[in-house]
């Protein structure tokens, strides 16, 4: 006999937890729709040359290859690269700026460890332009994710953001050539600490003086306005750096103008995002009181992601919530509601009154009351235990007395109170 088990890194929930997860997912989707994003669905399987078009070495290591095929196929690593392919294929049919959302599973060859998943849901929004895309969209993406996170009642959070042009311009100013390696090392600062970052920077041939100067730059802090003023006062003679500072300032002001609480936004010069395709604004989101959890929502601007698929310039900006990981984290912190059910009541007939229960069930359903009938030949105690296990608030009892009076006993399972009510009274109470 085969011992049933689920592979590590895969999510599989009991019904009551799945209901909570689906509710969170639906609330996020409702916000995306309210903000005028269109839903798309791309294949889980893509050609490897599509998946690896921009990801670099780390992405290549984590992509699941399909072994039984010689066609070089794999499972999608994220939803952004397939989006670039999608927009490139259908750009003649799309209206730009193209506003898209996608909530779907992605797959990564992660190590078996706590907080890492091989299959997980991502909730993505992106805005893609044709030849140009206003920086205003960077701010609008943040505003939409701000609303999405607020809708699911997570703890207080903070969008931390930066602009890669600032970092790349500063690297150039210091005479550092290997931008991408530097960005990847800085991206690890929160995880491995400053001493290990120094060691890794030295391994890419940065001398001690440049390392100290760079780290001192990354530590620039204060209010958001103070950080912007400090950056401007450095008088760095580098066009890319100046462009990045101006973009950072513009996006920050637009974020505030859209109604995001200033307490929920923070400029952090060490935010880089590890993926290679980001070119401007970059965002990471953290719980203020649970920083150890890591980023719960991230993204940024990518001006050249679709270059491998089309000669057209398709700049974009997007953000993503790793929903599976976020859900488990909220569970561990006891920040998601406990048992829930997705229907209003269970009808429990006494023996011989099953047909009455079925008729009542149909009448209630026709009146938009979500319900079911317990029709198994079990003792009354077992029937009530069933309702209790499903966390159903109301039970309707049908027996001889109820049928003779053409009424029904409505029992509140939370406090034990019972009422003898007519059908229309029950419908009004349950709807």
UniProtKB/Swiss-Prot annotation:
- Name its cellular compartments: Cytoplasm
> Would the keyword Cell membrane turn up in this protein's UniProt record?
no
Q: Which GO terms describe its biological process?
A: histidyl-tRNA aminoacylation
Which CDD domains would you find in this protein's record?
HisRS-like_core (cd00773), HisRS_anticodon (cd00859)
Q: What is this protein called?
A: Histidine--tRNA ligase
Stored HAMAP family = His_tRNA_synth
Which reaction is this enzyme known to catalyze?
tRNA(His) + L-histidine + ATP = L-histidyl-tRNA(His) + AMP + diphosphate + H(+)
Provide the GO MF annotations for this entry: ATP binding; catalytic activity, acting on a protein; histidine-tRNA ligase activity; transferase activity
This enzyme's EC code(s): 6.1.1.21
UniProt cross-references to Pfam families, sorted A to Z: HGTP_anticodon, tRNA-synt_His
The protein's assembly and partners: Homodimer.
List the source organism: Finegoldia magna (strain ATCC 29328 / DSM 20472 / WAL 2508) (Peptostreptococcus magnus)
Of which family is this protein a member?
Belongs to the class-II aminoacyl-tRNA synthetase family.
One CC-aspect GO term: cytoplasm
Q: Write the record's keywords in alphabetical order, separated by commas.
A: Aminoacyl-tRNA synthetase, ATP-binding, Cytoplasm, Ligase, Nucleotide-binding, Protein biosynthesis
**Which InterPro entries does the UniProt entry name for this protein?**
aa-tRNA-synth_II, aa-tRNA-synth_II/BPL/LPL, Anticodon-bd, Anticodon-bd_dom_sf, His-tRNA-ligase, HisRS-like_core, HisRS/HisZ, HisRS_anticodon
């Amino acid at each position: 006999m085969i011992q049933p088990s689920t592979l590590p890194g895969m999510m599989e929930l009991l019904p009551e937890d799945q209901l909570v997860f689906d509710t969170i997912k639906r609330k996020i989707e409702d916000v995306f729709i309210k903000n005028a994003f269109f839903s798309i669905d791309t294949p889980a399987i893509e050609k490897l040359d599509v998946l690896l078009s921009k990801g670099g070495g780390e992405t290549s290591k984590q992509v699941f290859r399909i072994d039984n095929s010689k066609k070089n196929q794999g499972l999608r690593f994220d939803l952004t690269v397939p989006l670039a392919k999608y927009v490139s294929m259908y750009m003649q049919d799309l209206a730009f700026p193209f506003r898209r959302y996608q909530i779907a599973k992605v797959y990564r060859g992660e190590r078996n460890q706590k907080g890492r998943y091989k299959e997980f849901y991502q909730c993505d929004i992106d805005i893609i332009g044709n030849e140009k895309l206003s920086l205003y969209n960077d701010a609008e993406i943040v505003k939409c994710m701000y609303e999405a996170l607020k809708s699911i009642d997570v703890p207080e959070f903070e969008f931390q953001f930066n602009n890669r042009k600032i970092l790349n311009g500063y690297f150039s100013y210091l005479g550092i050539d290997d931008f991408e390696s530097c960005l990847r090392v800085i991206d690890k600062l929160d995880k491995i600490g400053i001493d290990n970052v120094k060691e890794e920077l030295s391994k890419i041939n940065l001398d001690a003086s440049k390392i100290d100067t760079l780290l001192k730059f990354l530590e620039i802090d204060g209010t958001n306005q103070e950080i912007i003023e400090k950056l401007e006062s450095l008088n760095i003679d580098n066009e890319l750096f100046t462009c990045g500072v101006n973009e950072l300032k513009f996006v920050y002001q637009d974020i505030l103008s859209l109604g995001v609480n200033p307490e929920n936004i923070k400029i952090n010069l060490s935010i880089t995002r590890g993926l290679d395709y980001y070119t401007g604004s970059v965002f990471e989101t953290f719980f203020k009181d649970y920083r150890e959890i890591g980023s719960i929502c991230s993204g940024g601007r990518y001006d050249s992601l679709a270059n491998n698929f089309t000669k057209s310039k398709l700049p974009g900006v997007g953000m993503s919530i790793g929903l599976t990981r976020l859900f488990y984290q909220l569970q561990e912190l006891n920040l998601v509601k406990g048992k829930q059910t997705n229907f209003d009541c269970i009808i429990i007939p006494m023996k011989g009154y099953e047909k009455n229960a079925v008729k009542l069930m149909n009448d209630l359903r026709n009146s938009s009351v979500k319900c079911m009938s317990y029709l198994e030949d079990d003792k009354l105690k077992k029937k009530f235990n069933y309702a209790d296990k499903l966390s159903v608030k109301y039970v309707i009892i049908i027996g001889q007395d109820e049928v003779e009076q053409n009424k029904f006993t409505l029992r509140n399972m939370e406090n034990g109170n019972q009422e003898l009510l007519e059908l229309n009274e029950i419908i009004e109470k349950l709807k």
